[in-house]
Swiss-Prot record:
SUPFAM superfamilies: Phosphoenolpyruvate/pyruvate domain (SSF51621). Its cofactor is Mg(2+). This is 3-methyl-2-oxobutanoate hydroxymethyltransferase. The gene is panB. GO terms for cellular component: cytoplasm. HAMAP family: PanB (MF_00156). It is found in: Cytoplasm. Pathway: Cofactor biosynthesis; (R)-pantothenate biosynthesis; (R)-pantoate from 3-methyl-2-oxobutanoate: step 1/2. The lineage of its organism: Bacteria, Pseudomonadati, Pseudomonadota, Gammaproteobacteria, Chromatiales. Keywords: Cytoplasm, Magnesium, Metal-binding, Pantothenate biosynthesis, Transferase. One of its GO terms (molecular function) is 3-methyl-2-oxobutanoate hydroxymethyltransferase activity. It is an enzyme of class 2 (transferase). It catalyses: 3-methyl-2-oxobutanoate + (6R)-5,10-methylene-5,6,7,8-tetrahydrofolate + H2O = 2-dehydropantoate + (6S)-5,6,7,8-tetrahydrofolate.
Amino acid sequence: MGRLTLTKLQKMKRQGEKITMLTAYDASFAALLEAAGVEVLLVGDSLGMVIQGQESTLSVTMDDMVYHCRNVSRGSQCTFILSDMPFMSYATPNQAMDNAARLMREGGAQMVKLEGGRLLGEIVEHLTARGIPVCAHLGLLPQSVHRIGGYRVQGREEISARRIQEDAMILQEAGADMLILECVPARLGSKITDALKIPVISCGAGPYCDGQVLVLYDMLGISPGKSPSFSRNFLEGTSNIPNAIQAYVSAVKKNEFPLLELSY
């Protein structure tokens, strides 16, 4: 049995089956997540904060991402592996291609994720034309935290919401095969999910998207500092980590997480 494919994830969207995704950074947790039925492992540059103790994701390097992606690949057999491309690793089409190829060839990633809107259209086209699947990332962009003035909800104003939706359509047209929406109002998450053919995964974008993703350490209630308001500590009330992961998967599949009243 091989790894879950992009074709299967697209089929899940069409059939209305929720996609479960969690971040993973090492082989041991990758194995636990796979055993619990998580479909997608996101090797996130959030490792800069939860693994390395940095204040943001900006210091994470390509070598860091390849290292952790390789470990996650070794620890899993069937899950789909998505890897972040770190800050300034995709400034030009050729740089993006070289770095994405490293993540796939050396790290075992099946797809790479880029943060940003319509200006990334050329880079998305460049990658997908060369057989590299791309996940777009809109809404709150952690790699742009200094430009936007902190970790704030995006798309609350009509102009901002319209631009995010337009960006989503443009990136889909450019070839993106998946989209993560972070910290936007639930109504905007619903609107974009309905408008796109590709799977849309919510990270604080409400319950109406095609799937959900959380930072693993937030989901277990062990992240340093305060977890996002839309998150939930699934370890609370369960006896161990495997049960907490299974509770997350079950809650997403049954539309019991996230709660609309805790969405933006």
